[in-house]
Amino acid sequence: MLKNILLWSLQLSLLGMSLGGNVLIWPMEGSHWLNVKIIIDELLRKEHNVTVLVASGALFITPSVSPSLTFEIYPVPFGKEKIESVIKDFVLTWLENRPSPSTIWTFYKEMAKVIEEFHLVSRGICDGVLKNEKLMTKLQRGKFEVLLSDPVFPCGDIVALKLGIPFIYSLRFSPASTVEKHCGKVPFPPSYVPAILSELTDQMSFADRVRNFISYRMQDYMFETLWKQWDSYYSKALGRPTTLCETMGKAEIWLMRTYWDFEFPRPYLPNFEFVGGLHCKPAKPLPKEMEEFVQTSGEHGVVVFSLGSMVKNLTEEKANLIASALAQIPQKVLWRYKGKIPATLGSNTRLFDWIPQNDLLGHPKTRAFITHGGTNGIYEAIYHGIPMVGVPMFADQPDNIAHMKAKGAAVEVNMNTMTSADLLSAVRAVINEPFYKENAMRLSRIHHDQPVKPLDRAVFWIEFVMRHKGAKHLRVAAHDLSWFQYHSLDVIGFLLACMASAILLVIKCCLFVFQKIGKTXKKNKRD
């Protein structure tokens, strides 16, 4: 009996090993990496083998030791300070030139300089792999079954095609959804689908629709001009004429890091899966000292305040303005802040270099979340049903807060123009008016009421692609059409030609008949 049990256990063990696949991860930075790291951990839990490509100058990826996790480090001609510099320039450029109808061209010109620096770093990362024959040979022998990448960081798709394996994208957004629209072939009707970064909702006036239409066209132009240089790189790397967009279009699955608790209803394609909030989880107990501080709040509860990891500190004037507002509320405040201690800091506010944000938002005493509007933080607030005060600064943050405002779960204040009274009023509103808490809880219920959890859905589709060597049955035929075929311009041209020919024929016939009648009438008169 014992022998049979041991044999059965051994068979199950071997079966589990045989089911484990080999996954390759293309390097990425910032929140892009933090989200993929969650997926990696789940893949490891399910006994897959994961190899992460890591540039020697990587800023966020910290190699660790694990039996099923391998970090393949390769040299690049720059250090961590270079990536940190590009990120800093990106944030500052956006803060100083936040795009609006009046500043869009200035924003475009300044951002073009930053993106050019980003391209130089990206090319260094690409060359570090593609021109490293030893590494490429090792990857060829790795028997990988799928590659996971973020399209914001180019070349993961090139590596996948060179290895002859399918690839999957993990993506939050591209400006005005240009990548999803032109490369993924997702339709984005500007009449009711607001362009990402436009800060519009799906309820648009005529003026809003004009602005939305222009936003799409402007972002299309920016993508075409700023990313066009990659077409020649991709053609050279793959040894045939191609484009960045055409190659991106070969992705089997697009894992979109949002969901319908956040998005406005819009059309999508079957190979686009929504996995927003995949990093969210139930709250864990707080550190002892932090829990004691939270408990001193009594019935008033606490407010959590974080501007994310990208903003290291604020100007002294701005920090004092914020501290002054927070000192006037009865709630205790936990503020993630590394700068100089503000002179106006109230006794109810405590500063922390780092906070367990998810655990704090899930604490029963938390009443509000003051946030910069990053997608990860917003999803943790949605998960736990916490209303927000948005202080957006750059990238998708203003757009994210616009979504939460439209859904009644947030109030926005402008970081550049806000006064202490503005911030105080916003915090009091989300805490004291039931409207915001009710809507936050409604979004939370929607988020939790899914047939499959976001993380499980993401891993399922990765395993699906491994099992079936791709997901070609979900890929629309639009990828095989030229731009004029996609918009049916050839059909419209043909039908117009037919109509013109028919009209011309009718005119010719009428002229012929009139001529005959005229000749007959003249002949009768002569007779």
UniProtKB/Swiss-Prot annotation:
Cellular compartment(s): Membrane
InterPro entries tied to this protein: UDP-glycosyltransferase, UDP_glucos_trans, UDP_glycos_trans_CS
Glycan-linked positions: 49, 313
Extracellular side: 21-490
Record EC number: 2.4.1.17
Transmembrane portions of the chain: 491-507
Main location: membrane
Membrane topology summary: Single-pass type I membrane protein
One GO cellular component term: membrane
GO molecular function, one term: glucuronosyltransferase activity
Region forming the signal peptide: 1-20
Assigned keywords, A-Z: Glycoprotein, Glycosyltransferase, Lipid metabolism, Membrane, Olfaction, Sensory transduction, Signal, Transferase, Transmembrane, Transmembrane helix
N6-succinyllysine: modified positions: 134
Pfam families (alphabetical): UDPGT
Cytoplasmic side: 508-527
Family statement drawn from the similarity comment of this UniProt entry: Belongs to the UDP-glycosyltransferase family.
Function: UDP-glucuronosyltransferase (UGT) that catalyzes phase II biotransformation reactions in which lipophilic substrates are conjugated with glucuronic acid to increase the metabolite's water solubility, thereby facilitating excretion into either the urine or bile. Essential for the elimination and detoxification of drugs, xenobiotics and endogenous compounds. Catalyzes the glucuronidation of endogenous steroid hormones such as androgens (testosterones) and estrogens (estradiol and estriol).
Name of this protein: UDP-glucuronosyltransferase 2A1
Organism this protein belongs to: Rattus norvegicus
Organism ancestry: Eukaryota, Metazoa, Chordata, Craniata, Vertebrata
